[in-house]
Structure formats: C-alpha cells, structure tokens
Amino acid sequence: MNNKSGFTSWISPSNIALVKYWGKKENQIPINPSISFTLKNCNSKTKVTYSQSNKGFNYEFFFHGEKKKSFNKKIDTFFKRIIQYCPSLNHLSLKIESENTFPHSSGIASSASAFSSLSLCIYEIEKMINENEKDFFNQSSIISRLGSGSASRSIYGPVAVWGKTKHFENSSDDYAIPVNNYHKIFNNYMDTILIVDHEKKDVSSSHGHELMNTHIFKVDRVNKAHENIGDLKKSLISGDLESFIHIVEQEALMLSLIHISEPTRRSM
C-alpha cells in the first residue's frame, strides 16, 4: 500500500433533471432513464482527510464545520454499498468536511452534489492507495449512484444521461455518461432558483421513490420517460427550443400530477 495518509478535495455541482428518474429498484437502479443539466453555482465542496486505521474503517462527518450525526445513516449506507469498489476503506480513518452553496433538503438536489463530491474524493484515495487503473470518472459515477441516484449525473456536465436507453449508446443503469452532442444555444442556459422556504421538505425523495413502485401510473410514466428522452435528444441536437420547452414542461407537469395523485404525497 502507498500513500497511507493525506487529504483530497473536490467540488461537484448539483443538477436539474429535464427528464427525471422517479422510482428505483434495489441498489439505486432507476426504473427509467434521466437526463440533466448541471448547476455549476449550486455545488458542494468536500474535503476528506485520511489516515491508516488499526481499528478498521471509521469516519467523522462535518457539515459547515459542525458535526452532523443526522446525516450518518445515509453515509453509513453509502459506505457499506461502495466497499467492494473501494477496499482501501477497510483500513482507513476519515475526516469528512462538506459545505454547500445552497440549502440542503429544500428541493434542490443537495444529495447529488454532496455524494458526487464525496465519491470523487473517496475514489481518488482508492486510486492513490491501490493504484487502481479503472476509469476514474466512470467509477466515481458508479459509487455516487450508491449514495444518491442523481449524484451519478453530477460527475459529468454540462449534460448527462443516467439509465439504460436505446437513444444513447453506452448508457447504463449503473452510471451516467456525458452528452457532448448538443446545440451551442444551450451553452448560455441558466437556472434561476428562488428559495421561499429554507426548511426541510415534508417528504424525502427516497420515500417518494418508494411510493412510485406501487403507483397506478408507474408503467405509463416509465414508457413516457423513455419517449421523452428520445425526443429531448433531438431537441438538444437541433436547438429546437419550442420542442425543448414543450418536453421539459410536460415532464414537470406529469411529475406534479403523479405527486398529487394516488397515493397522495407531497415530495416536491
């Protein structure tokens, strides 16, 4: 083993889905593909300091300089899932320091930026210690997914696809891929975020995904998402804004209807 102690730091953006994944299988596998724009100014910065541990894996987590044990359950689950990809963790002690440029759990995908930045740190440590030759960003996307599904897309940008679909070659349920073929008009697109409530939302995204598994519109939603991915790809390439706006608005309205239909839940 080399580089048994040190630190690394990464900044990773949140993202906004144009076609959203809603509903998942075991191990964070989506029931439908999704495509997103990254939000470069809504980001998480994570620093991980590591050292050799004689007592097995352990960590401390700090959010904006304060210990946040309320996040430990999600982080514990994340580390259990990724240990097969990052065996060096078995012999490490970590100090994780994270901060956001925007509120967490308020409707912006803070888990996407948080877990993607953490995953980039963790996999960089793995590569330094075990001299892993696997593709860095691909593997980072895989382990990001195991923390938060949408985090897999935050590894890439400005446009990324996650989920197997016939419309994008090499797409996968396990990781996101970058989308490089899009019209230059989208280079100047910006996202305006108005925060009217800093409080944590009533229903978590994770619980919302669980509800989708038994939703009466599940099959229709999955089929429509696949169709919209294909149509949106055409709009992105051609720069057809009328079509682009129609598809994205249709997606927003469809997800809103799903949220307020049976079973009744509010998770936006």
Residue ranges, per PLM feature:
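ATP-binding N-lobe of GHMP and related small-molecule kinases
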Residues: 1-106, 120-137
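ATP-dependent small-molecule kinase catalytic core of the GHMP/sugar-kinase superfamily
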Residues: 135-259
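Single conserved hydrophobic/aromatic residue that forms the stacking wall/gate
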Residues: 258-268
